[in-house]
């Protein structure tokens, strides 16, 4: 709840900063002659940004849950291996190799979380530069990026609430 409201404040700051930079194009050359940035739904790039932004929280959640499953499978295989190779574990005469299991789990978790970690960093860049290349307009690119951010904010709140209620978070 409060994180979602905080994110909405950040979106308002994004829109406010865009207006400021566009109005002061002489001071900020990248924004010179950018024109007005509109988040109107009549702009197809805004709609595309909303659709792409709505997808990202679900994609992130799906990839992250798959990563957890793969890491869990790796640890199950390690435990089975230790039971096979050290039959005294069940009898209490041998100790399991906890260090190897923890090391294996840590490596698997780090390896599996690379793509979900890159997704929030690379997706906004793809939106901005993709729209910029297609439309040739910085104003459309910034509008699509703003719509993307707004959709991510709204959908991530819903995904977080849903995952909390079903025990996935």
Swiss-Prot record:
Entry's localization field: Cell inner membrane
EC main group: translocase
UniProt entry keywords in alphabetical sequence: Cell inner membrane, Cell membrane, Hydrogen ion transport, Ion transport, Magnesium, Membrane, Translocase, Transmembrane, Transmembrane helix, Transport
Gene Ontology MF term list: diphosphate hydrolysis-driven proton transmembrane transporter activity; inorganic diphosphate phosphatase activity
GO CC annotations on file: plasma membrane
Annotated InterPro entries: PPase-energised_H-pump
Cofactor (UniProt): Mg(2+)
Pfam families for this protein: H_PPase
Segments passing through the bilayer: 45-65, 114-134, 141-161
Signal peptide: none
EC number: 7.1.3.1
Membrane topology summary: Multi-pass membrane protein
Free-text function comment from the UniProt entry: Proton pump that utilizes the energy of pyrophosphate hydrolysis as the driving force for proton movement across the membrane. Generates a proton motive force.
Family recorded in the similarity comment: Belongs to the H(+)-translocating pyrophosphatase (TC 3.A.10) family.
Subunit architecture: Homodimer.
Name this polypeptide is given: Pyrophosphate-energized proton pump 1
Organism of provenance: Rhizobium leguminosarum bv. trifolii
Upper lineage: Bacteria, Pseudomonadati, Pseudomonadota, Alphaproteobacteria, Hyphomicrobiales
Gene: hppA1
């Amino acid at each position: 709840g409060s994180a979602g409201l905080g994110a909405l404040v950040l979106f308002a700051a994004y829109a406010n900063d865009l207006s400021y930079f566009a109005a002061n194009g002489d001071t900020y050359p990248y924004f010179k002659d950018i024109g007005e940035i509109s988040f109107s739904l009549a702009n197809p790039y805004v709609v595309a940004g909303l659709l792409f932004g709505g997808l990202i929280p679900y994609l992130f959640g799906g990839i992250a849950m798959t990563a957890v499953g793969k890491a869990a499978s790796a640890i199950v295989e390690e435990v089975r291996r230790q039971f096979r190779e050290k039959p005294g574990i069940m009898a209490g005469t041998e100790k399991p190799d906890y260090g190897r299991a923890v090391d294996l789990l840590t490596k698997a978790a780090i390896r599996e979380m690379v793509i979900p970690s890159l997704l929030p960093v690379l997706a906004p860049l793809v939106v901005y530069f993709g729209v910029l290349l297609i439309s040739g307009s910085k104003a459309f690119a910034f509008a699509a990026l703003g719509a993307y951010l707004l959709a991510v904010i709204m959908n991530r709140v819903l995904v977080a609430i849903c995952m909390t209620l079903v025990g996935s978070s």
